[in-house]
Curated annotation (Swiss-Prot):
Keywords: Cell cycle, Cell division, Septation. Belongs to the MinC family. Interacts with MinD and FtsZ. Cell division inhibitor that blocks the formation of polar Z ring septums. Rapidly oscillates between the poles of the cell to destabilize FtsZ filaments that have formed before they mature into polar Z rings. Prevents FtsZ polymerization. InterPro entries: CAP/MinC_C, MinC, MinC_C_sf, MinC_N, Septum_form_inhib_MinC_C. SUPFAM superfamilies: Cell-division inhibitor MinC, C-terminal domain (SSF63848). The keyword Transferase does not apply. This is Probable septum site-determining protein MinC. GO terms for biological process: cell morphogenesis; division septum assembly; regulation of cell division; regulation of cell septum assembly. It comes from Neisseria meningitidis serogroup C / serotype 2a (strain ATCC 700532 / DSM 15464 / FAM18).
Length: 237
């Protein structure tokens, strides 16, 4: 079996609890009234990060995002990203330098619970998230506490993140980060390897040049061995 081994930087991941704000109104005056009271709590704790869930709004034009981000910021609440089930919101997020989280929709399906074999350590059952649509530049998809399966093409500048494994059954030109919470047994499986960056449990490799022919645009798996990323062709001996 031909194996391509890369040395990589060690990145120490850190955990940051991020709350989600489900927005129910676009009225800045109503929000201001609430934030004057609620904001005092967060101002005492310093700046608190949030993801803004805008699922109740169909179009980005429904909201004055610049004013919203500024309003929350003045009250000690830092908006890091937007969450919506429609990909049209990705461009709006990029415009204001925010992350975009694709929430569950008809193109995002939970495949249910997969039983974990070893339950003695109290591990939770792992969920799998399936993405059937292309993941475009600037979009980020995160499978929390589970695996991620993508059947659409992943564009350069798109980012896939999973706490478990990542499976990509299409050309992969973006970034894939498996084992995001430190699972060193996580793996990445790619049908057509053209990624710009891959990472397992914080150990990553940035690809500035194409891989050798037996790996470039070929099915590969990526895993950790002795704290090094190993990229091997699937089906090779």
């Amino acid at each position: 079996m031909m194996v391509y081994i890369m040395n990589a930087f060690d990145i120490k991941s850190t955990k940051m609890d991020v709350l989600s704000i489900s927005l129910h109104t676009s009225d800045l005056f109503d929000l201001e009234d609430v934030l004057v009271k609620l904001g005092k709590k967060f101002q005492e704790s310093g700046v608190v990060p949030f993801v803004l869930d805008v699922q109740e709004f169909d179009y980005p034009e429904s909201l004055d995002l610049a004013a919203l981000v500024s309003l929350f910021s003045r009250h000690g609440m830092q908006i890091l990203g937007l969450k919506h089930s429609n990909e049209r919101w990705a461009a709006a997020a990029m415009k204001y330098h925010l992350l975009f989280c694709l929430s569950h929709s008809e193109n995002v399906k939970e495949l249910g619970q997969v039983e974990v074999q070893n339950t003695e350590d109290g591990q939770k059952a792992r969920k799998t998230v399936l993405i059937t649509s292309p993941v475009r530049t600037g979009q980020q998809v995160y499978a929390e506490d589970g695996d991620l399966i993508v059947t659409g093409a992943v564009s350069q500048g798109a980012e896939l993140i999973a706490d478990g494994n990542i499976h990509i059954y299409a050309p992969m030109r973006g970034r894939a980060l498996a084992g995001a919470k430190g699972d060193t047994s996580a793996r990445i499986f790619i049908h057509s390897m053209q990624a710009e960056l891959v990472s397992v449990a914080g150990i990553y490799r940035n690809f500035e040049q194409d891989l050798p022919n037996h790996l470039h645009k070929q099915p590969v798996q990526i895993l950790l061995q002795d704290n090094r990323l190993v990229i091997s062709a699937i089906g090779s001996e």
